[in-house]
């Protein structure tokens, strides 16, 4: 399955946009809020019901994003946590979302997602998804190509939204 996220380049106060499938049908809606100390984003279903709220943790050595069911909750649904990775221009993140674990390796314009076991070990040959930031487009565009059996669409949308929030928010 393919999900596509398209945003406007210039917005004031936040950006609301659709996440569509390969046919252009809206599957999710998202909203990013830029003028806050911490980067955050909301993910909604097509009817406008909030699925999750993502918020950056300020004091974290390699970076951390908490995923909540809604703003103000006390127990997170999931956590994106950065880890040490000695390769230049590549960052490795761990996603633990509702008991499912993934290792996410990101460069400046692409991201690879691997399913992981409880010890964060993964097989490099079995990639669950791949995100590309599409260059030379009128709108800020991300394309997530993923295997639905290894990576549920909701988690794929969360990872795509996180990739934009964590790596490309300062470009708006």
Write out the residue ranges for each language-model feature:
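Intrinsically disordered, low-complexity proline/glycine-rich segments
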Residues: 1-172
């Amino acid at each position: 399955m393919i999900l596509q996220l398209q945003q406007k380049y210039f917005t004031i106060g936040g950006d609301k946009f659709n996440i569509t499938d390969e046919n252009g049908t809206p599957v999710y809606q998202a909203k990013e809020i830029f003028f806050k100390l911490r980067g955050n984003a909301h993910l909604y279903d097509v009817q406008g019901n909030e699925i999750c709220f993502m918020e950056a943790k300020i004091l974290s050595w390699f970076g951390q994003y908490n995923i909540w069911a809604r703003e103000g909750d006390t127990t997170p649904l999931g956590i994106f946590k950065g880890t040490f990775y000695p390769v230049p221009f590549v960052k490795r993140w761990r996603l633990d979302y509702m008991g499912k674990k993934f290792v996410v390796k990101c460069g400046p314009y692409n991201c690879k997602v691997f399913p992981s076991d409880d010890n964060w070990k993964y097989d490099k040959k079995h990639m669950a998804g791949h995100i590309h930031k599409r260059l030379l487009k009128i709108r800020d565009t991300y394309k997530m190509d993923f295997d639905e059996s290894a990576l549920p669409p909701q988690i794929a949308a969360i990872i795509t939204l996180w990739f934009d929030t964590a790596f490309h928010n300062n470009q708006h």
